[in-house]
Regions:
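Mature N-terminal, pre-catalytic/accessory segment of carbohydrate-active enzymes
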Residues: 19-34, 240-495, 500-505, 574, ...
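Structural preference for beta-rich elements and adjacent junctions enriched in aromatics
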Residues: 20-282, 286, 323, 329-332
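Carbohydrate-binding surfaces of carbohydrate-active enzymes
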Residues: 257, 266-268, 330, 393-445, ...
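Extended substrate-binding grooves/exosites of carbohydrate-active enzymes
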Residues: 455-456, 466-473, 490, 512-513, ...
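The substrate-binding groove and active-site-proximal loops of carbohydrate-active enzymes
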Residues: 463-472, 493-511, 552-571, 596-600, ...
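Short, acidic/polar
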Residues: 471-484, 571-576, 696-709, 751-759, ...
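Aromatic-lined substrate-binding rim segments of carbohydrate-active enzymes
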Residues: 476-552, 672-679
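Polysaccharide-binding and catalytic clefts of secreted carbohydrate-active enzymes
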Residues: 553-716, 720
Length: 1019
């Protein structure tokens, strides 16, 4: 049976209603975006895309799907097309979505049905996150039926907000089917230039929603929906007419079958011309062939979908395999899928077999431990087995859950991973017992009464790195497994409703349960970071004080602290909660608010804040005439100032208003800090805020408080999903304090390799405490995309083993961390420019990327630090686009230059104060601010780079540090597999000890992609 993408359907029956999760064809090549003739005006017909030769990009395979309750291709299905001419990139997509759901406004398009498109214009992002030029935009229908295009991240080309330059059309194309068409001007994708470049990094998501809530998505690659990881994008390559080819895919209508079921096998074939085609289907059970059938179909340009219904007979074992060999004019392909015969009973038997194997291995492990063998590393596999079996066995007792999320194939896959894990662990233990493997004992200093010194956590005199999961109640039930996994930390939370549900009500059962859990955790040597976030607003408080629901702010608090009742609620919560838990010595930190921000004055302004601002401006300027001169406005008086309007039209006013917001936000944060210290004196405090908001132009202002001053108020710098640049920034702003990421997200797509690589890069760039979201066995689209820790056994094992490595090498890692604030090269961090120069954040990010591969650490230097003379060891200060500076900054820059400092800025840079008045001059060396230009400058100045790498193309990150008379250096290759020959003081290094493996290595060696290696060279 055949259904072409044009919509003609010839199906013998229907098989919608079941979730699908089948093995699929791997797609790893480029997509070829063919040229087309202008003009392309969009008739609203897929036939037009076919006529122009567009190749299909099928989002049809299992790896493309992040919709837990997907019910087959007749539920949600999407095929994308791209074309180009000299002026536009054309985007087309045919989408079937059985139950549409839309958002009221364009900024939330990703929460409804519609597309997100992400671009790495120069295909140059090699570090986690987005770099300066990366772009993310979206298309979709709004609730009122209109079509909208929106930019969430504009890179160097676009402002955040609605996209007027994109021509968009959305046309009904059949039952539950829409054709999306968009013309994106190439100028919107700068610095990509189709006249000079032929490829760019790209990802596309189709988001599907139900009842206004994001259900999940189909994507080409990971890297947008879960976390922003542009280095995972694949390439779109510009091609001429008729050049290149597309890829085929296969899927099934559900994840598992029973005897007698009908199965619907869908083939997505990249046909390019009309003609007759055939598919030869073969069904096998093991080596035995049980069915063979040949199906003819009519091939069309732009792709053809072949639907083949197969009536399953009796199923035995794990099921059947379908092999499909398709042939059509000009092409052929071979695909396969499994018709799985799974049942809870069968998987319970498999679980029992894994459990018995794990029990036998535990006995072996205990015997080896008693004999003095260091078993920390193979023990991680056993811990993963225990915890995975625990939660999956629970799942197997819940038929509705198994059906809703199509869990049986996923559970089967996890059990296979457990067996493979145990196999490796058994071999590793045998090697340790025989002496064939070198033991790597892991120190276990007590996780209680930790102190902070020189930017690091200490247990006594030992530096410690803290790593573990964030969850709710489940971590307290799994303390033994957490410890055996290699973790030394965990985190949990209580909300306001659980402590003070109303002004006259107090509940302490949750607090006492936390206290009991902490005492139990101490037995397993686990530290605890307590998220005491006073959110959401309890209904009892809102009923008593309805004003608390007005002017929402404070991140997850959801209520402005200008409300006296909100402050009273926070005080009451912590007054009752903290005395119950504060005396536990393994309570090492309090996280004050989940994803805190000071967002008062972003979209609306509280009357108290407005009055304070007007009074502050009157005090600052004295007369409205003086204020108007700075702002370039014609305001009548201070009492009529409207910040919400004026900040949109006056750069000088925006600077004054955002500076005022910063001061007010600091007062808010001091209130939170002082309240917590009142009830838990001596416990270190931090506050979690989303990291991207610090240095991102579209997300920066809502936080409202500068990271530097925020870090000075708390005991260490807290964040959520920090990237390498943010971590360098934090360590620079508060050099003597640790940095934490207390909500790092992982998805079901996170591989073991990525898990290890991300942890190492974060710690080496200054992170001392890291928590993974989330330790829970629950299911939702959000958790599968961003909190799937207990659903990826192999990756969880990799995290546990990496945690052991980090704990073992904590002194060496801390040595690298301390090199960041001692760096000789710094980037100027200018809050004034962050407020007033739209292109500054992107240029700052680009300069950081250019500096990241020159074999020396990079720090940030703030305007405040400059003015205070706190320049550390900085010899070179780079000013990338910070054109508006405080007047005292200009004076400090002149002083820095007078002390032999070098200031680098782009040619033609002109500096003014925040209001546009020219600043006194200071010596500047003009530079292109590229890696090559920086490298030449550093050689000229003789900067300290004792160990140099040899990998070309800016793909190597290398840092060095001296410790105890030895030279340490680490290397991370962000490019293809290359031969690596390091140089020490200009001479090739012959050999070194690789500290993670403990092995002696000889150079040159082959350096894999994103595998961290730490070397020690002794004198």
């Amino acid at each position: 049976m055949v259904r072409t993408l044009l919509g003609a359907v010839l199906l013998a029956g229907t098989a919608a209603g079941w979730a699908g999760s089948s093995p699929v064809l791997q797609q790893e090549g480029d997509y070829f975006c063919r040229a087309t003739d202008a003009p392309f005006e969009f008739r609203g017909e897929l036939a037009e895309w076919r006529e122009r030769g567009a190749l299909p990009l099928f989002l049809a395979a299992e790896k493309n799907r992040m919709i837990p309750d997907w019910e087959g291709p007749l539920d949600v299905d999407a095929t994308v097309y791209l074309l180009h001419d000299a002026q536009y990139l054309y985007f087309g997509a045919l989408v079937r979505d059985r139950l549409p759901s839309y958002q009221p406004g364009p900024e939330a398009l990703y929460r409804g049905d519609g597309f997100q498109l992400a671009f790495d214009p120069l295909d140059d992002t090699i570090l986690p996150g987005y770099d300066a030029n990366d772009i993310e935009l979206g298309f979709g229908r709004l609730r009122d039926g209109s079509a909208a295009a929106y930019c969430w991240r504009g890179g160097e080309a676009l402002p955040t907000g609605r996209l007027a330059d994109v021509r968009l059309k959305i046309t009904p194309a059949g039952e539950h089917t829409l054709l999306y068409e968009a013309a994106i001007p190439w100028r919107c994708l700068a610095p990509f230039d189709p006249r000079k470049l032929e490829k760019f990094g790209f990802d596309v998501l189709y988001n599907s929603a139900r009842d206004g809530k994001r259900r999940g998505w189909l994507h080409w690659t990971p890297g947008v929906g879960e976390e922003k990881l542009a280095f995972l994008f694949r390439n779109v390559r510009l091609a001429g007419k008729g050049e290149g080819a597309a890829e085929a895919a296969i899927n099934l209508d559900r994840s598992q079958y029973s005897s007698g079921d009908p199965a619907l096998v869908s083939l997505y074939l990249p046909t390019e011309q009309a003609g007759k085609g055939q598919v030869h289907f073969t069904v096998r059970q093991g080596e035995r062939e049980v069915w063979r059938e040949t199906v003819g179909f009519d091939a069309l340009p732009g792709g053809t979908v072949v639907r083949w219904p197969y009536q399953i007979g009796r199923l035995r074992g794990d099921g059947l395999q379908v092999d499909a060999r398709a042939v059509w004019p000009g092409g052929e392909t071979a695909l396969n899928a499994e018709l799985l015969n799974l049942s809870p009973e069968r998987l319970k038997q498999q679980a029992q077999a894994v459990a018995e194997r794990a029990l036998a291995f535990r006995k072996r492990l205990e015997a080896a431990r008693n004999a003095g063998v260091a078993v920390d590393y193979p023990l991680t596999a056993l811990a993963v087995c225990d915890v995975t079996l625990k939660y999956r066995r629970r799942d197997l007792e819940k038929p509705a859950l198994l059906k809703e999320y199509a869990l049986l194939p996923k559970i089967r896959r996890q059990f296979r991973q457990l067996n493979a894990m145990l196999e490796r662990a058994e071999q590793e233990l045998a090697g340790l017992e025989s002496g064939a493997l070198k033991p790597r004992p892991v120190p276990a200093p007590p996780m209680r009464n930790l102190t902070i010194r020189d930017g690091a956590f200490y247990s006594g005199d030992e530096e410690v790195l803290l790593i573990g999961p964030l969850g709710w109640w489940e971590p307290f039930d799994d303390l033994k497994s957490l410890s055996e996994l290699g973790f030394n930390l965990f985190s949990s939370t209580l909300i306001a409703q659980a402590v003070t549900p109303a002004p006259d009500k107090v509940r302490l059962d949750g607090a006492r349960r936390i206290d009991r859990g902490l005492r139990e955790a101490a037995k397993y040597n686990l530290a605890f970071d307590f998220l005491i976030s006073p959110h959401p607003l309890p209904q009892g408080w809102k009923e008593k004080h309805p004003e608390m629901a007005q002017y929402p702010s404070g991140g997850w608090i959801g209520s402005s602290l200008y409300h006296t009742a909100t402050r009273t609620m926070i005080d009451a919560m912590w007054k009752n909660l903290l005395p119950v838990v504060r005396d536990n010595p393994n309570l090492i930190a309090l996280d004050l608010v989940n994803e805190w921000s000071f967002s008062d004055g972003v979209r609306e302004i509280h009357p108290v804040m407005l009055a304070k601002f007007r009074a502050a401006m009157r005090e600052q300027y004295g007369s409205i005439a003086a204020a108007n001169r700075n702002w370039g406005t014609g305001c009548r008086d201070f009492d009529s100032l409207d910040p919400m309007k004026l900040k949109q039209v006056s750069t000088g006013f925006r600077y004054d208003f955002e500076s005022f917001r910063n001061r007010e936000g600091l007062e808010n944060l001091r209130f939170l800090r002082d309240t917590a210290r009142k009830y838990a004196p001596g416990t270190p405090l931090h506050v979690k805020s989303i990291a991207v908001t610090d240095l991102d132009p579209g997300q920066y202002l809502p936080v409202g408080v500068q990271r530097e001053e925020r870090g000075e108020i708390t005991d260490f710098a807290g964040s959520d999903c920090a990237g390498i640049m943010e971590l360098d920034f934090y360590r620079s702003m508060v050099p003597g304090k640790p940095v934490a990421d207390t909500e790092f997200h992982v998805s079901v797509n996170t591989t073991p390799h990525e898990m290890a690589a991300d942890a190492w890069s974060a710690m080496l760039h200054g992170e001392s405490l890291r928590e993974y979201y989330a330790w829970t066995g629950r299911y939702s689209a959000e958790l599968m995309a961003a909190g799937a820790l207990l659903h990826i056994p192999e990756s969880l094992e990799a995290l546990g083993r990496t945690a052991l490595d980090l704990r073992r090498l904590a002194p060496e890692v801390v040595a690298f961390q301390r090199r960041i604030p001692d760096a000789e090269v710094a980037l100027l961090y200018s809050p004034a420019s962050m407020y007033t120069v739209p292109e500054y954040p992107a240029r700052l990010r680009r300069a950081h990327a250019e500096l990241s591969h020159l074999d020396l650490p990079v720090r940030f230097l703030s305007e405040r630090q400059l003015a205070a003379g706190k320049t550390g060891k900085v010899k070179v200060l780079v000013i990338p686009g910070a054109q508006r500076l405080e007047r005292k900054t200009a004076e400090a820059l002149a002083d820095f230059a007078a002390r032999s400092g070098t200031i680098l800025a782009a040619p033609g840079t002109r500096f003014t104060d925040p209001y546009g008045t020219a600043l006194p001059g200071f010596p500047v060396r003009e530079s292109e601010l590229t890696a090559a230009a920086f490298d030449r400058e550093f050689d000229r100045l003789g900067l300290n780079r004792p160990v140099r790498g040899n990998l070309p193309g800016g793909a190597l990150e290398l840092r060095s540090a001296e410790r105890d008379g030895a030279m340490l250096f680490y290397a991370v290759n962000y490019g293809a597999l290359r031969e690596f020959q390091p140089l020490l003081d200009g001479r090739p290094i012959a050999e070194a000890t690789e500290l993670i493996s403990g092995e002696t290595v000889k150079f040159p060696l082959r350096l894999p992609n994103r595998k961290t290696m730490i070397f020690e060279v002794k004198p």
